[in-house]
């Protein structure tokens, strides 16, 4: 596999999630963190939105980060001028390429689409900018028309094409076939932009890289429009462990940036969230916990420390005597077989009542209570 780059769009598509609104300070903090962990490119926002967005972007540009910075634009010269005014040297130009999008936005006049694309690319290239082109709704576009558009964009000076599964309707097999055809026909690299409407954003992004795409759009925690985007932490760790492709990103800080974005967005990370969720390395059931105590690889695909997490062994409804005894021994409590079973029955009952596993403090309190009860 050729080197794949991450172009994170948390500050653009991530913030477009309903109800999310980053402050200037939060956007700067997120950009600095993405850069610090080694993300290659950051889509910093939409300059044409207005003064507040432009202020945030201009301040990020002034940080002189190692990551390349990209502004999102429509195929409108005024948009590109706004990007230039912010100090950006790389622009992304989005244009609809499916029949339904062109019908709604350009009354079906595909010639207008091509003209606007030509004019905007030409202007940006004349200004010495790196130009990325995005085919909005590429996944539903007629394939021959899509190829014609991208070949034209390539001829006019575009440096990259973003294949957008805008409404998240692809599966990995179809994604691979479509992207492979594009890669074979182009000399410029293809970038993947996938949405999670059917829970396949990360899978489709990976399929695109297998087909030859050299860049992937991600967002931290999968934040984004509707069901979200391909999650940065998922794409990075999947490429590392499933495809043995290390991107040079400091994965040990993935939990930190996840928590930063969760706080800034006002959307907590679900416990079962892949890679960074609280339960990702938590073990309760007896069989699993026993295996992990013997060898963590029995029930963990990689070490929790790789993403900044720690392994947690917790007691609850599904726990067994071995796990319970192991946790109690860590607190210098040793029970005989009968006592252990007595406490385990109580743990299971309380777990059902609380609808969760028990904390260590709750377990110790329960042991003290039950021992006192039996002594009476």
From Swiss-Prot:
Gene Ontology terms describing biological process: biosynthetic process; carboxylic acid metabolic process; nitrogen fixation
UniProt keyword annotation of Transferase present: yes
Catalytic activity annotation: acetyl-CoA + 2-oxoglutarate + H2O = (2R)-homocitrate + CoA + H(+)
UniProt keywords, alphabetically: Nitrogen fixation, Transferase
Signal sequence annotation: none
EC number(s) from the headed UniProt entry: 2.3.3.14
Pfam families: HCS_D2, HMGL-like
Any one Gene Ontology molecular-function term assigned to this protein's record: homocitrate synthase activity
Domain Pyruvate carboxyltransferase: 4-255
Function: This protein is a Fe-Mo-cofactor biosynthetic component.
Protein family according to the UniProt entry: Belongs to the alpha-IPM synthase/homocitrate synthase family.
PANTHER family named among the record's database cross-references: HOMOCITRATE SYNTHASE (PTHR42880), ISOPROPYLMALATE_HOMOCITRATE_CITRAMALATE SYNTHASE FAMILY PROTEIN (PTHR42880:SF1)
Name this polypeptide is given: Homocitrate synthase 2
Organism: Nostoc sp. (strain PCC 7120 / SAG 25.82 / UTEX 2576)
């Amino acid at each position: 596999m050729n080197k794949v780059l991450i172009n994170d769009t948390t500050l653009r598509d991530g913030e477009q999630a309903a109800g999310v609104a980053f402050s200037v300070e939060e956007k700067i903090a997120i950009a600095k963190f993405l850069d610090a962990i080694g993300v290659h490119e950051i889509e910093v926002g939409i300059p044409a939105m207005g003064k507040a967005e432009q202020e945030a972007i201009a301040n990020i540009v002034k940080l002189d980060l190692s990551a390349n910075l990209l502004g999102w634009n429509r195929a409108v010269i005024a948009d590109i001028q706004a990007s230039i005014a912010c100090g950006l040297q790389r622009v992304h130009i989005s244009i609809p390429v499916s029949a339904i999008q062109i019908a709604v936005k350009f009354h079906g006049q595909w010639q207008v689409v091509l003209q606007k694309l030509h004019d905007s690319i030409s202007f940006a290239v004349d200004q010495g900018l790196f130009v990325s082109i995005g085919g909005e709704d590429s996944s539903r576009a007629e394939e021959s028309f899509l190829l014609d558009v991208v070949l034209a964009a390539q001829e006019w000076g575009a440096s990259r094409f973003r294949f957008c599964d805008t409404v998240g309707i692809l599966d990995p097999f179809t994604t691979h076939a479509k992207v492979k055809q594009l890669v074979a026909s182009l000399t410029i690299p293809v970038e993947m932009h996938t949405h999670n409407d059917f829970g396949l954003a990360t899978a489709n992004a990976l399929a695109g890289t297998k087909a030859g795409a050299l860049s992937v759009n991600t967002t931290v925690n999968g934040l984004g429009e509707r069901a979200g985007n391909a999650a940065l932490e998922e794409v990075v760790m999947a490429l590392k462990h499933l495809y043995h492709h290390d991107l040079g990103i400091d994965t040990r800080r993935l939990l930190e940036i996840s928590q930063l974005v969760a706080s800034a967005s006002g959307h907590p990370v679900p416990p079962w969230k892949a890679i960074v969720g609280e339960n990702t390395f938590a073990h309760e059931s007896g069989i699993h916990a026993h295996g992990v105590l013997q060898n963590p690889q029995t029930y963990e695909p990689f070490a929790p420390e790789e993403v900044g997490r720690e392994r947690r062994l917790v007691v609850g409804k599904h726990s067994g005597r071995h796990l319970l005894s192991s946790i109690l021994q860590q607190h210098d409590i040793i029970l005989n077989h009968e006592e252990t079973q007595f406490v385990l029955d109580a743990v299971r009952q309380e777990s059902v009542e609380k609808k969760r596993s028990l904390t260590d403090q709750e377990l110790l309190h329960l042991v003290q209570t039950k021992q006192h009860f039996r002594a009476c």
